[in-house]
Amino acid sequence: MEQIQTSPIFLGFSSQKGGVGKSTLAEIVSSILYYEKNIHLFVVDCDLSQDSFYKLREREKACVESDPQLSKQMKQHFFSLKRTAYRILKADPKEAIEKANEYIRKHPSEQFDLVIFDFPGHAGTSDLLQLSLEMDYILSPLEPDVQSMVACLTYIKAVNDLGVSMSSVRIKEIILLWNKVDRRVKNTLIEYYSRYIMVETTFICTFVRLIILIKL
C-alpha cells in the first residue's frame, strides 16, 4: 500500500472480542489528544456497526442541528477551544490506508501528527490483518477473562505470523490494555493474567508490550 514521506503516526484500536470498549477508548483518546493536547489528527472509522465512530458523530450532529439553543452552545464551546471538531472518515478496511493517505495529500497545510483507525469488532480477515501491519502502533483493550485473553493472543499471533512472512512491515508495537476491570476482582487475578500473557507473547511475538490501563 502507498505511503507518503511525511506520513503521520498511524494508531489503530483493535480487539478480537466485542464489547471490550474499543471504540469508546478510541473516542476518548482522540478527544483528549486533539482538544486538550493539541495533537492534530483525524479518525478513520473502519467499524461498520451501529455504534461506530462515524455514526455516533452523525447522530450528535443531527441532535445539535435540531436544537437551536444547543447549536448556539456548541458554537460557543468550539470558539472557546479555538478549534473545530476533528474529521472522521468512513472507510472499508481494505481501503482505509489509501483513503487516509489521500486525505493527507489533499490537505498538505494541515500537517497531521496522528491518524487514528477504529478497527471493526473482529479483526480476523486477511484485509484486517494487513491493515494491522500498516499501523505504527495498535492499542488492544482486553477484559480479565479467559475468552478475551485467548482472542487477544490469537490475534497477536496472526499479525506476527503474517508480518514475518513479509519483507517489511510498519507495525512497531501492539499495546495491550486492561479495560472494564471489575474493582471487586482481586489484584492477584489481574497480575496472574498479566504474567500469563507476557509469557505467552514472548514465544509468539517480539513487538508486544503489555500495560495496565486501570490500577486497582
Feature annotation, model-predicted:
Residues 180-216:
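Beta-strand-loop-alpha "switch" segments that mediate conformational coupling across diverse proteins
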Residues 24-25, 29:
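Hydrophobic positions on the alpha1 helix immediately C-terminal to the Walker A/P-loop
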Residues 110, 126-146:
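Inter-motif core of Ras-like GTPase G domains
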Residues 4, 14-20, 35-114:
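P-loop/Walker-type NTP enzyme "switch/lid" segment
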Residues 30, 34-35, 132:
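Gly/Ala-rich phosphate-binding loop of Rossmann-like dinucleotide-binding domains
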Residues 2-8:
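Phosphate-binding P-loop
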Residues 108-127:
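Glycine-rich phosphate-binding loop used to anchor ATP phosphates in small-molecule kinases
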Residues 152-168:
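Conserved C-terminal guanine-recognition region of P-loop GTPase G domains, centered on the G4
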